[in-house]
């Protein structure tokens, strides 16, 4: 079953402390990691900046991305890959995700209070 992962992040002070050259080197490393993940069937659907004008917009983070992968195992490998890049050293980060379910199933769970 396909899994989807939404990442949310903002800069840490450690990111701001890097020189532009260091940031560029890190960005290149992230680009390579994204390519490796794509070859493993993990694909990005895109990256974005949080739209603060959106009704009830998430205020805790500045950026987001969404990923699609074939299984929970692929998701776990993805998260290990993110950690291996050093991403969490430079960004406050939270994840949201799981397999997509039908609206009917999730609404029924709400009715049951689950």
Describe the role of every protein-language-model region.
Residues 39, 84-87:
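Secondary-structure boundary motif
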Residues 87-100:
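Conserved short beta-strand edge segments in small beta-sheet-based binding/regulatory domains
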Residues 65:
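Conserved, mostly hydrophobic/aromatic
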Residues 76-85:
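Short amphipathic alpha-helices in soluble, non-transmembrane regions
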Residues 1-61, 69-75, 99-114:
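Short S/T/G/P-rich N-terminal loop/turn motif that feeds into the first structured element of a domain
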